């Protein structure tokens, strides 16, 4: 039997057990390692036991070190359980309290005394002077330490800046390759790490470096040949082979599978996350609808993409603040107030404020086409608002508050939460301070009574910040809002998730912040996106987002009803139908690169065939079904070396790549990369379903396969949550 012992946390209680029995000392081979924190006992090809307590119990029972049938041994068994399950400090207290006898049970040292000593020694806690130190265990500990010291450094997983081998299995292998390649080539370790990529074909290897990426002067193919010859294989990296200018590495598949399963099973919902940017704070401003205008497809894109970005920053250790910056100020609210006096209806306002205010807004704009003086009334009303007249503000407040209540309902349905509801109206004196600073810096110019910033030399046109009547514009309020946010939140990054049509506005804003020499000018970023085309109901009219979502729900509900047996098994089928519909909408929205326009295609969107939202939900629900129908519980200690089939290896390779994906999303923030990953994993899972059954398999194989399916479900579910989907258990 092989006992892998973590060098940095030697379990002396296990060494004490081994030292107490001659047969055990001869049978067990001690293997020092720095790769794990838990001892692992490999009994045979089918049985592996992980964890100090589990290994200790196995050794005690297998070698009859305690006669459990003997009544006098019951007290010994009780002490063994206490020692193996309680905290070392409690064991220390119990030892101190035991004063009737020299040792725990009598005046002669027994196995429980050796165990107790081992626990205390491992925890570096003192033991009573009268106790005999287990010298044989200390000698074994010294042998382990000596063995680790003489073993090659390649057994140690290097900790490289910006990597997380404790949560990302691919970092384990990449760090080892990058470290040794740095010693061979002299190329910077980070450059080597970043150059490591998945090859197009696994026939050539598991990881590859395109030598030209390293920017080394000379012949890339020749370098690849020379470096491959010098590379020393080890337990983790089995070979390095040069193919043209590429250096291909083959990693130990058994270790990859084992480490992947260990991490996915251990971290669960947190699998894939890292803490590399812990302590940093980001504001993500997204959705930001205009009150009195429809919550339409453009807002849907900003909402879905913004929530995704917030999730990505969360997963990479940032503290995030999701902010909804409502369009709740400006001349249009003067127009809305004038319109409400003419066309408003209190009941309709209470029932659905967003729709009713939009109807009022459309009608008053129609009126204004026939009677241009309405615009003068609107401007006068908005001036009263800016001057703080209470009567004007009270009506505006009602519109705003009622609209926010309705928005929150829609966001809850989309599985989206905002930390802050802000708006143009909330900007305080930051706007006035910014205008004053613009004036003092000589940036502000007069233009026919208005105040402008001339940005033409930056190819950003002229930007108006104050109209002739003294009222402000979007840009003015955005400058003031940015200043106030930095003063309040001291963010490390602020992201505006806004459509590409606003590119010029955001460039003008950022350039103005730069000209004002604000400390945070280099901490702002615009994440843009293309348009949704053809987003209308089956009746052909452009409508509110809720109508689109209701239609999606109705379509999916109709599909679900076609299978009466499965439909009757689903709890709350209407909610499930709604979630499948939302998944269809979100996945279609996120399937292409952000900047691309896309055609809203309901026939494709709600299909269970091909790469769609419903297909991903089905893959997750089917994984849940495998767990339910197996009749087994997940065994984290299952022998995954039994997973030798190509289908299983492929699934776990993809699972292993998920933490890398999460980290890489910080560059580009493209949700389509997660969608592609989710489809790839779903297809591989589907192939497994056909080939690798759990029910009917031998117990050890069933355990291993079920653990693999569990890790796949954890990973697929986490990818779905990143995209804002709620993984379904039945459908």
Regions found by a protein language model. Give the residues of each.
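Non-catalytic interaction-recognition regions
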Residues: 157-257, 265-731
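Short helix-to-loop capping/linker segments positioned immediately adjacent to catalytic or ligand/cofactor-binding
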Residues: 67, 100-107, 313, 662-668
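GST superfamily/GST-like fold recognition
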Residues: 103-125, 132-144
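GST-like domain detector, emphasizing the conserved glutathione-binding G-site
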Residues: 1-104, 121-122, 126
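Active-site rim elements
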Residues: 46, 103-105, 125-130, 393-397, ...
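Eukaryotic N-terminal low-complexity, Ser/Thr- and Lys/Arg-rich leader segments
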Residues: 1-12, 17, 25-27, 145-179
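Amphipathic C-terminal alpha-helical segment
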Residues: 119-127, 584-590
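All-alpha amphipathic helical-bundle segments outside canonical DNA-binding/catalytic cores
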Residues: 68-73, 101-112, 568-577
